[in-house]
Protein backbone atom coordinates (compact mmCIF):
# COMPACT_ATOMS: atom_id res chain seq x y z
CA UNK A 1 0.00 0.00 0.00
CA UNK A 2 1.35 3.52 -0.76
CA UNK A 3 2.70 5.38 2.23
CA UNK A 4 1.83 9.00 3.02
CA UNK A 5 4.94 10.48 4.60
CA UNK A 6 3.76 13.93 5.70
CA UNK A 7 0.98 16.46 5.30
CA UNK A 8 2.67 17.95 2.22
CA UNK A 9 1.37 14.90 0.27
CA UNK A 10 4.68 13.09 0.01
CA UNK A 11 3.57 9.77 -1.39
CA UNK A 12 5.78 6.79 -2.18
CA UNK A 13 5.01 3.26 -3.21
CA UNK A 14 5.30 0.53 -5.79
CA UNK A 15 3.29 -0.29 -8.88
CA UNK A 16 2.64 -3.69 -7.34
CA UNK A 17 0.59 -1.87 -4.66
CA UNK A 18 -1.14 0.69 -6.88
CA UNK A 19 -1.06 0.83 -10.66
CA UNK A 20 0.23 3.89 -12.49
CA UNK A 21 -3.29 4.46 -13.87
CA UNK A 22 -4.78 4.37 -10.37
CA UNK A 23 -2.09 6.76 -9.12
CA UNK A 24 -2.81 9.25 -11.91
CA UNK A 25 -6.52 8.99 -11.14
CA UNK A 26 -5.88 9.67 -7.43
CA UNK A 27 -3.79 12.76 -8.24
CA UNK A 28 -6.40 13.96 -10.74
CA UNK A 29 -9.41 13.55 -8.46
CA UNK A 30 -7.59 15.35 -5.63
CA UNK A 31 -6.30 18.12 -7.98
CA UNK A 32 -2.72 17.71 -6.74
CA UNK A 33 0.31 19.53 -8.11
CA UNK A 34 3.92 18.38 -7.87
CA UNK A 35 6.59 16.15 -9.37
CA UNK A 36 5.92 12.45 -9.82
CA UNK A 37 9.11 10.42 -10.21
CA UNK A 38 8.80 6.83 -11.43
CA UNK A 39 11.55 4.25 -11.83
CA UNK A 40 12.01 0.60 -12.70
CA UNK A 41 15.55 -0.75 -12.86
CA UNK A 42 17.48 1.74 -14.98
CA UNK A 43 14.32 3.26 -16.50
CA UNK A 44 13.25 6.65 -15.14
CA UNK A 45 10.30 8.95 -15.85
CA UNK A 46 9.44 12.33 -14.39
CA UNK A 47 5.97 13.82 -14.65
CA UNK A 48 5.00 17.31 -13.58
CA UNK A 49 1.41 17.32 -12.34
CA UNK A 50 -0.53 20.59 -12.25
CA UNK A 51 -4.01 20.60 -10.72
CA UNK A 52 -4.24 16.85 -11.23
CA UNK A 53 -3.28 16.95 -14.92
CA UNK A 54 0.01 15.85 -16.48
CA UNK A 55 1.63 19.11 -17.58
CA UNK A 56 5.00 17.66 -18.64
CA UNK A 57 6.47 14.18 -18.93
CA UNK A 58 10.08 13.27 -19.68
CA UNK A 59 12.31 10.23 -19.63
CA UNK A 60 15.83 9.62 -20.88
CA UNK A 61 14.53 8.65 -24.33
CA UNK A 62 11.17 10.36 -24.74
CA UNK A 63 9.08 13.41 -23.95
CA UNK A 64 5.35 13.99 -23.84
CA UNK A 65 2.51 11.47 -24.01
CA UNK A 66 4.86 8.64 -25.05
CA UNK A 67 6.35 8.69 -21.54
CA UNK A 68 2.91 8.30 -19.96
CA UNK A 69 2.03 5.45 -22.33
CA UNK A 70 5.30 3.67 -21.55
CA UNK A 71 4.85 3.89 -17.77
CA UNK A 72 1.22 2.76 -18.08
CA UNK A 73 2.64 -0.57 -19.23
CA UNK A 74 4.83 -1.04 -16.16
CA UNK A 75 3.61 -3.75 -13.79
CA UNK A 76 6.60 -3.27 -11.46
CA UNK A 77 8.52 -0.21 -10.34
CA UNK A 78 8.42 2.50 -7.74
CA UNK A 79 7.20 6.07 -7.49
CA UNK A 80 7.52 9.17 -5.35
CA UNK A 81 5.31 12.25 -5.45
Predicted regions, residues:
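Acidic, Ser/Thr/Pro-enriched low-complexity segments and adjacent helix/loop capping patches
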Residues: 1-81
